[in-house]
């Protein structure tokens, strides 16, 4: 068995994760605003992958010219990470916000399972507290009238899948230990963009038709702002 040691910047990283989790918890606000502005058919999610990819592409080409990492050498990490976020983003368009958040944020359950199976790590005691809180939230939201708390629509299942993919990507990164953040970032947008295109095609009956040119023009400033942020 491999026992994990605490990182020297454990509390700093934990605080950063807390802020990041809170910001991702508010992601449904711009996502639904973009849909209300006309970006139907899951194209709000697609554009949030494709536009940053296009902005980073010149940097990747420059890195390739300099003999550095181009950024596409982690396809599995990019596919899992980008696919997880794509599922999370599109789930807000197909189910209630609270249901999407609860199902996505039980990610620690899947992370713990993957760590035990693939990394042979023994969870610390506070992980069990996290798991208990996560599963309690699922039971409160989905376990009404004593029924088994299972997802009830396509948006629920997509949110659940998103959490599983994010957990798998975290474990994969722990195994591969990539050097630097840029290759992960570029792989995320490239492979995540491919995932969103395929997902939107298969979910077209649920997500709606492609947006009009007028909607693209009206929403483009907001899409560029989101991409920069």
Per-region residue spans from a language model:
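Glycine-/small-residue-enriched transmembrane alpha-helix faces in small-molecule transporters
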Residues: 1-43, 87, 132, 136, ...
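Loop-to-transmembrane-helix transition segments
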Residues: 12-20, 64-87, 153-162, 209-229
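Transmembrane alpha-helices of multi-pass small-molecule transport proteins
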Residues: 12-13, 37-83, 110, 164-169, ...
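Membrane-interface helix termini and inter-helical loops of multi-pass transporters
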Residues: 29-41, 142-154, 201-223
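Hydrophobic/aromatic residues within transmembrane alpha-helices
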Residues: 34, 44, 91-92, 117-119, ...
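Structural motif at transmembrane-helix junctions in multi-pass transporters
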Residues: 36-43, 87-103, 181-182
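Hydrophobic transmembrane alpha-helices of multi-pass small-molecule transport proteins
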Residues: 56, 126-144
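C-terminal transmembrane-helix exit sites in multi-pass transporters
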Residues: 60-63, 90, 107-132
């Amino acid at each position: 068995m491999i026992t994990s040691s605490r990182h020297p910047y454990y509390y700093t990283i934990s605080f950063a994760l807390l802020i990041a989790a809170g910001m991702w918890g508010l992601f449904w606000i711009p996502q639904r605003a973009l849909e209300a502005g006309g970006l139907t058919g899951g194209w709000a999610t697609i554009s949030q992958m494709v536009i940053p990819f296009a902005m980073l592409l010149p940097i990747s080409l420059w890195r390739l010219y300099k003999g550095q990492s181009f950024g596409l050498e982690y396809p599995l990490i990019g596919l899992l990470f980008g696919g997880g976020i794509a599922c999370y983003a599109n789930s807000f368009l197909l189910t209630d916000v609270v249901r999407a958040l609860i199902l996505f944020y039980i990610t620690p359950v899947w992370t713990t399972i993957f760590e035990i199976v693939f990394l042979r790590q023994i969870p610390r005691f506070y992980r069990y507290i996290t798991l208990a809180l996560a599963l309690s939230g699922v039971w409160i939201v989905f376990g009404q009238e004593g029924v088994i708390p299972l997802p009830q629509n396509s948006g629920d299942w997509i949110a659940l899948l998103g959490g599983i993919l994010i957990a798998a990507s975290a474990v994969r990164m722990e195994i591969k230990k990539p050097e630097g953040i840029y290759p992960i970032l570029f792989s995320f947008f490239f492979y995540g963009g491919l995932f969103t295109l395929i997902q939107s095609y298969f979910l077209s009956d649920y997500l709606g038709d492609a947006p009009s040119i007028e909607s693209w023009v009206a929403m483009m400033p907001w899409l560029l702002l989101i991409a920069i942020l």
